[in-house]
Design a protein with these regions (language model features):
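Hydrophobic alpha-helical segments, chiefly the membrane-spanning helices
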Residues: 302-304
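Signature of Asx- and small-polar-rich beta-strand/turn repeats characteristic
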Residues: 1-290, 294, 298
Length: 304
């Protein structure tokens, strides 16, 4: 390896930059799926003279638009108007892509790294579950953490890092800091594979999802009225090499606390990944406790 690749400021190869950023506990942002907001409405049918009490929009593909497939990532249930029988899903957030499930069977006798095999995985949609064996139906949800503070031997967490070729890797605890997975357990990874920014600015959608009421009746797609409340936006490419080199040392220097104006800016950008840039300033005379944050997003500017 060339000497310049051993240092973050001068490194140019992404895998080398990512490995150096790991030393600063920095996880580069993955590709991000475009998202839109829909309103869905349909007329339910009476059963024995009464309308169903509620209706559920099932997780999975719900719409097509702009040559893409759009999904909801969890079941959504709303109540049915008992007088009219109309059910309304007022703010349905949909994301572009395909939902993928990938499983590993735990083998502690070999060094096992749990890789997400898809390069275009939106890591913000990642759900990690562990079940006792292949035939088990119940599973435990594990949460991502980036610090060992307050973790016990039984805390169900995982640690995330970008690996080679922009494919992310998951590691579990060691029964000291976080629970370790056991032989024969099954690790289930669910995430969205997306086209990123290509899915932006789509405003016309056709419903393809599944809606089921409390009596078990499934409604045809043609019976659903669909209205676009917000066209698709916020799809983005994975974080660039230059962005990683800039953000990693600043994220590390903040150390999860906001003291300086730069700390506020870095932490805010980490939380609000739709921000193009963040500027924080404050410390004005007689108002030392006030920090102003100006955040131009990809669609508008937010100040608070």
């Amino acid at each position: 390896m060339a000497l310049n690749e051993a240092f973050l400021p001068s490194s140019t190869v992404r895998d080398n930059v990512v490995n150096l950023a790991k030393l600063l506990n920095y996880v580069p942002r993955s590709i991000q799926a475009a998202k839109a907001c829909l309103k869905l409405e349909l007329q339910t049918n009476q059963v024995n003279g009464a309308y169903p009490s509620n209706i559920t929009l099932k997780k999975g593909p719900v719409a097509t638009g702009g040559n893409f497939v759009w999904n909801v990532l969890a079941d959504t249930t709303v109540e049915v108007n008992t007088s009219t029988g109309i059910a309304t899903f007022d703010k349905v957030s949909i994301k572009e892509g395909s939902i993928v499930n990938f499983q590993y069977i735990v083998n502690t006798f070999a060094k096992q790294i749990y890789k997400i095999p898809s390069e275009d995985a939106d890591i913000s949609t990642l759900a990690v579950r562990v079940k006792a064996n292949e035939s088990a139906t119940a599973s435990d949800l594990y949460n991502q953490v980036d610090t060992v503070t307050n973790l016990t031997a039984t805390t169900r967490v995982y640690f995330l890092a970008e690996g080679e070729d922009m494919r992310y890797e998951i590691r579990f605890g060691d029964d000291s800091v976080g629970r370790a997975v056991k032989d024969g357990e099954v690790v289930d990874l669910e995430y969205l594979v997306t086209s990123g920014p290509d899915g932006n600015q789509v405003g016309t959608f056709s419903f393809i999802g599944k809606i089921e009421d409390s009596t078990g009746k499934v409604y045809p797609t043609a019976s659903v009225n669909i209205v676009t409340k917000q066209k698709s936006q916020q799809g983005d490419k994975a974080e660039s090499v230059e962005s990683i080199k800039y953000n990693a040392p600043r994220y590390y220097s903040a150390q999860y606390r906001a003291v300086t104006a730069q700390d506020y800016a870095i932490i805010t950008k980490n939380i609000y990944d739709n921000a193009d840039s963040v500027v924080a300033y404050g410390g004005d005379a007689l108002n030392l406790s006030l920090i102003h944050i100006s955040e131009p997003t990809r669609q508008a500017e937010i100040s608070y």
